[in-house]
C-alpha cells in the first residue's frame, strides 16, 4: 500500500517495540548539527542584513526595515538562541547528563561482506 493511501486507510494500530522507539547516534548528531548551525545563523542576525541583493531588487533600506520589524528580528534571534541551547542539550544527552541512555544497535558489514551486530 502506498503512503498516500495509508493516510486515508491506515493500517491497524499496534504497540511499538522498544527497538523502534530508541534513539540513534546518527539521529542525535544530525539534530545537534542542524540545531547549532541554523540557530547560529538566526541568532547572528544575518537574515536581517541589508545588502547588495536587496538593493539590486530595488528595495530601499526603509522598505527593508518595514518588511523586517524589530519584534520579528528579536523573535527570530531568540528562536536561534533556543535552537543553539537545544542543540547542546541534545548533543550532550547521552554522555553528560543521561548516562544510562541506550541507543539502537546497527549491523555493520565486515570485510568478508557478512553483517554483524554492533
UniProtKB/Swiss-Prot annotation:
Other known facts: Present with 752 molecules/cell in log phase SD medium.
PANTHER family in alphabetical order: ACR195WP
Primary subcellular site in the record, as a coarse category: mitochondrion
Source organism: Saccharomyces cerevisiae (strain ATCC 204508 / S288c)
Protein name: Uncharacterized protein YDL157C, mitochondrial
Keyword terms, alphabetized: Mitochondrion
Domain of life: Eukaryota
Compartments (UniProt record): Mitochondrion
Family according to the record: To S.pombe tam6.
InterPro entries on file: Mitochondrial_unc_protein (IPR053092)
GO cellular component labels: mitochondrion; peroxisome
Amino acid at each position: 500500500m502506498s503512503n498516500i493511501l495509508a493516510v486515508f486507510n491506515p493500517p491497524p494500530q499496534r504497540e511499538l517495540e522498544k527497538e523502534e522507539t530508541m534513539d540513534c547516534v546518527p539521529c542525535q548528531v544530525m539534530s545537534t548539527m542542524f540545531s547549532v548551525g541554523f540557530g547560529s545563523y538566526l541568532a547572528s542576525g544575518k537574515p536581517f542584513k541589508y545588502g547588495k541583493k536587496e538593493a539590486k531588487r530595488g528595495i530601499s533600506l526603509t522598505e527593508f526595515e518595514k518588511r523586517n520589524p524589530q519584534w520579528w528580528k528579536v523573535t527570530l534571534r531568540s528562536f536561534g538562541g533556543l535552537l543553539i541551547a537545544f542543540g547542546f542539550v541534545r548533543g550532550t544527552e547521552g554522555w553528560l547528563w543521561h548516562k544510562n541512555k541506550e541507543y539502537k544497535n546497527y549491523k555493520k558489514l565486515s570485510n568478508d561482506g557478512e553483517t554483524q551486530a554492533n
